[in-house]
Amino acid sequence: MDNYEKQVYTGRELFLKYDQDKLIKKYGLKHDEEYLYLKYIGTEYRINRRNGAIEYATGEEWTDCREYTVVMTIYDFLCCSGQEILPPLTGQWQPVGRFVTAGSSPSTDPFVEKYARAFFGKVEEVKQACICLGGKQMQRLAGADLTFEMPVLPEFSVLLQFWDGDEEFPPKILLLWDKVSLSYLHFETTYYLQGDLLKAILLSLIHI
């Protein structure tokens, strides 16, 4: 078993320690005797109530989820907050770096730039991909070609901005977080979620 698998099993064990009825109430989860259900970035997932394993819907079938970032984000979302009632999102958006002391968080620029280049010249396609994933187009902010509120988890959204490139400026992506986001997720998990969201947009874009 490699380190990733060990951490996934640690996440399962943590999830299984929680009162699932309280999680159902807290997050408004659909459920039955065997599974809890939630949507993550436009895809339906279910969590086995007995062993904590996570599966995702593929048509009429359910498939074991082996994406480490997806699995750990779902576990963290359900298990991060010790509050019985979560604070409502404020609509006050900020960069992820605002949550930590200056200089203490790793830069995501090279990672995000990879997706910005892939989206270059495809404003309409990126728009349709965001809509396919449940995104709501918002008023343009700071001159961005696209501004979307993306519902990524139950009652939890992030704000995506995209500026297309031209002869003078390269394309740019900026992801903004509600100021109470760390009541829902640990700081490190925001990086997993960011990657999962941009990957999902790119995959949707390819199929448009």
Residues of each region from the PLM?
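Conserved binding-pocket/active-site segment within a compact domain
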Residues: 121-183
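Short amphipathic C-terminal alpha-helix that caps PH/PH-like domains
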Residues: 74, 78, 194-197
